[in-house]
Each structure stands twice: as C-alpha cells, then as structure tokens.
Amino acid sequence: MPKQAIIPAGTTTPIAPFVPGTMADGIVYVSGTLPFDKDNNVVHVGDASAQTRHVLETIQNVIATAGGTMDDVTFNMIMIKDWADYAKVNAVYAEFFPGTKPARYCIQCGLVKPDALVEIASIAHVGNKA
C-alpha cells in the first residue's frame, strides 16, 4: 500500500522524525498535533480554549491539504494535561464538529512541553481526493 506524506505549506518542522499527516488508501492519519508556532514554541500559554482552537485549525489544514474537510474525520485521540480543562476543550471541539461527531477518546496525561495543555491526533477518510 503506497503512502503519501501530507505536509501543508508553511508547516512547522517537527521536533521528531514524523510528518504532520500520512495518507494511504484514502485515509489520512494526522500526527499528534500540539499548540506550536512555526518555531515549535507553545502558543496561547495558559489558555486551553485557544490552544484547542489552534490545534484543530492545524489539523483542519492537514486534512484540507489531502483534499478533505473536518466532516471526513472519523476518529480523534485527545490528550489533555489537566482534567479541569475538559469542558473548555469540548466547547471548542464542538465548533469544529457541528454535524455527526467522530468517535474519540480523551485522556489526561503529561505532554511533550510543560506549557502545552492539549494534543489531538485524527483519522479522516477523504477517499482519493488529493
């Protein structure tokens, strides 16, 4: 099964050996996405809502580069640093998935940088649009 790297224009260079997304057989696998700027610094420090929006906009860009939309997302894996931010993360999340919601799981865990409050990885079925 051939796979294609999905790297949107202007994407941050990852700090580890991976790409923002990979597509195989019309399925886009979006890597764990953190609230980073172009220099891999955490943005919106202390604001879980703004960090969630930044992460979901980044994921949206990866999926769009593959020819899809957020409506194509079928599964999300959400990691939050502090369970107290759960409602804030959900409020922003709901804005990006107003129709049929994707399946998902959400866990509390430590993240790669101390100021990061949320990380999301996604799977989207876009077909062969790209």
From Swiss-Prot:
Enzyme Commission number(s): 3.5.-.-
Gene3D superfamilies the UniProt entry points to: RutC-like
Pfam entry (one): Ribonuc_L-PSP
An individual GO BP term: nitrogen utilization
Protein name: 3-aminoacrylate deaminase RutC
Lineage: Bacteria, Pseudomonadati, Pseudomonadota, Betaproteobacteria, Burkholderiales
Organism whose genome encodes this protein: Variovorax paradoxus (strain S110)
Family: Belongs to the RutC family.
CDD domains listed in its UniProt record: YjgF_YER057c_UK114_family (cd00448)
Keyword Hydrolase: yes
